[in-house]
Amino acid sequence: MPSSDEQRAQLEAGIAALEAQRATLGNEMVEAMLGPAREKLAALESRSQSQQQRKQATVLFADVSGFTAMSETMDAEVVAGVMNELWAEVDRAVTDHEGRIDKHIGDEVMALWGADTAREDDPERAVRAALAMQAAVARFCETRGMTLAMRVGINTGPVVLGAMGTTAEFTAMGDAVNVASRLEHAAPVGGILIGHDTYSQVRGIFDVLPQDPLSIKGKAEPVRTYVVDRAKPRAFRMAPRGVEGVETGMNGRDAD
């Protein structure tokens, strides 16, 4: 049986061939013949979108503190324009670090690493993106005389990727996503809070401050958390082997 891609290619080729026969066969006949082919193509694409994948990903949530206060003193259209400009800068920090913008919800953004192409350093890229996002917000506020700050939560773990809900919106779901969202809400204003699963893959690369474990509904044990202070000038990735927490090896490389 042909694969989905092969079936799609065959249908698209057949549709193109029929389109080329309009002058000979006439629009009415071509449209009648195109109907079934288009329906099959639409069904194939819908089935493809509904397929879900399980992947290891790093999830980032961030929100802008001070947005509500700003909204109360400015016209709604002006606020929308300002936020669009700010999100353009923030989103660029994500994509510059090979992340994918999953969605914007009001003053919050969700981004993913590993959804499209998995990389060993996805957690590091996410944390570096978070630092770049905060720097972008600081520059934005400095040039406009505004007082805004961004808090960020980052977590790494298995997620389910696919088209979700009645709108078939492509997104990620799962425990790792829920934890990342909780980390964002628990993060200090202007801070980056990461879970232990992310920390275990970036230790030695960033200066971090251990925080109190975070209790999350539905999880048997509290999540160990860390506030990221900054990237180390020259970092070495600490590779845990054997027993977790015992760092017995390292791959030296500059933190570019």
Positions of PLM-derived features:
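Short amphipathic alpha-helical coiled-coil/interface segments
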Residues: I15, V30-L41
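Cytosolic regulatory/linker segments at or just downstream of nucleotide-handling modules
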Residues: V159, A186-E247, G252
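Charged, low-complexity interaction regions
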Residues: A20-M29
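Catalytic NTP-binding/metal-coordinating core of nucleotidyl cyclase/transferase enzymes
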Residues: S48-A129, A136
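Catalytic/regulatory signature loops of cyclic-dinucleotide turnover enzymes
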Residues: C141, N155-T156, D175-H196
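Catalytic core of nucleotidyl cyclases, primarily class III adenylyl/guanylyl cyclases
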Residues: F61-A62, A93-R125, R139-D175, V223-Y226
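Short linear X-Pro dipeptides
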Residues: Q51, M74, T167-A168, R241-D256
